[in-house]
Amino acid sequence: MTQINCTQVTEFILVGLTDRQELKMPLFVLFLSIYLFTVVGNLGLILLIRTDEKLNTPMYFFLSNLAFVDFCYSSVITPKMLGNFLYKQNSISFNACAAQLGCFLAFMTAECLLLASMAYDRYVAICNPLMYMVVMSPGICIQLVAAPHSYSILVALFHTILTFRLSYCHSNIVNHFYCDDMPLLRLTCSDTRFKQLWIFACAGIMFISSLLIVFVSYMFIISAILRMHSAEGRQKAFSTCGSHMLAVTIFYGTLIFMYLQPSSSHALDTDKMASVFYTVIIPMLNPLIYSLQNKEVKEALKKIIINKN
C-alpha cells in the first residue's frame, strides 16, 4: 500500500444521525428507550433460559448465545450514539474508534454465523427428530457456537488492523454515527485496493456460506414438513422454525439491502438508516420474535411471574 506523508489524525469526529438540534433530544429519548428494552429483553431471555430446566435444550442454548451477541452488538454502538445526541462535538479517539469497529465486526460476523448454526439445529430437529439429542450433543453445540465466535474474532482483528494501518489525513470527520468501514475508507490518503479486495472476499465468503447453510437447511425442513400427514405436526414444525425464519429474513434482508445495492445508488443517509436498523432495531426485535411465538418461553415467563406473586 502506498503511503502519503501527512499528519496522522489522533481522533475522529462523528457526524451522527442529524445535525438539527431540535431533533437530538427526542431521538435521545427514543434510542435510550430502545436500548433499555434491548438490554432487558436479551439479558432477561438469557436468565430465563438458564434458570428453567425445560429450556435446557440445544435450541435454547443457541438462542441464549444469540441474545448475548445481540446485547453486546447493541452495546458497542448505542451508548456512543446516545452520547452524540448530548454533546456538540462528537469526538472519538483513534484507538476507541478502532476498538468500536473491531467489536462491531466481531459481533456482526458472530450473529451471521450463529443464525446458520441455528438453522442447522432446526434442520436436525425437524428432519431427524429421533436422533436429535444424539446429533446435537453438548460437545457439538459448543463447537457450533465456538466456531462462529473464533472466526469472527480473527476476521475482525485482521480487518481492523488493515483499516487502521492506513493513513488518515484528508479529514477526520466521519459521516456516520459510529466507526464503520466504508465512511473511514473515504477519509484515507492510502491505497485502499487491497483493503477493499479483502472486504469483498471475506464478506462474500462469510455471507454466501452462511446464507447457503440457512437456505439448504430450510429447503430440507420445508420438504419434510410438506411430507407430514398430520396437520397438527405441520403446525408444530412451522411454529418451531417460524421465529428463526423471521429473524433470518430480517437480518439477511437488511445486510443485502445495505451491502449489495449498486454503488451508484449508495447514499450515506440510506446507509445510516439501514445501519440503525441492524445495529439498534434488530437486537431489540429478536427477543420479541423468539419469545412471543414460543410457547415454552411464554410458559417459563408465566411461571416466574406466578412464583413472584
UniProtKB/Swiss-Prot annotation:
Carbohydrate attachment residues: N5
SS bonds (residue pairs): C97-C179
Membrane spanning stretches: 29-49, 57-77, 98-118, 144-164, 205-225, 240-260, 273-293
Domain of life assignment: Eukaryota
Gene3D superfamilies: Rhodopsin 7-helix transmembrane proteins (1.20.1070.10)
Matching InterPro entries: GPCR_Rhodpsn, GPCR_Rhodpsn_7TM, Olfact_rcpt
A GO term, aspect molecular function: olfactory receptor activity
Main location: membrane
UniProt entry keywords in alphabetical sequence: Cell membrane, Disulfide bond, G-protein coupled receptor, Glycoprotein, Membrane, Olfaction, Receptor, Sensory transduction, Transducer, Transmembrane, Transmembrane helix
Family annotation (Pfam families): 7tm_4
Record-level GO cellular component terms: plasma membrane
Localization of this protein: Cell membrane
Extracellular face of the membrane: 1-28, 78-97, 165-204, 261-272
Membrane topology category: Multi-pass membrane protein
Cytoplasmic side, ranges: 50-56, 119-143, 226-239, 294-309
Function noted in UniProt: Odorant receptor.
Family: Belongs to the G-protein coupled receptor 1 family.
Protein name from the UniProt record: Olfactory receptor 8U9
Organism, scientific name: Homo sapiens (Human)
Gene designation per UniProt: OR8U9
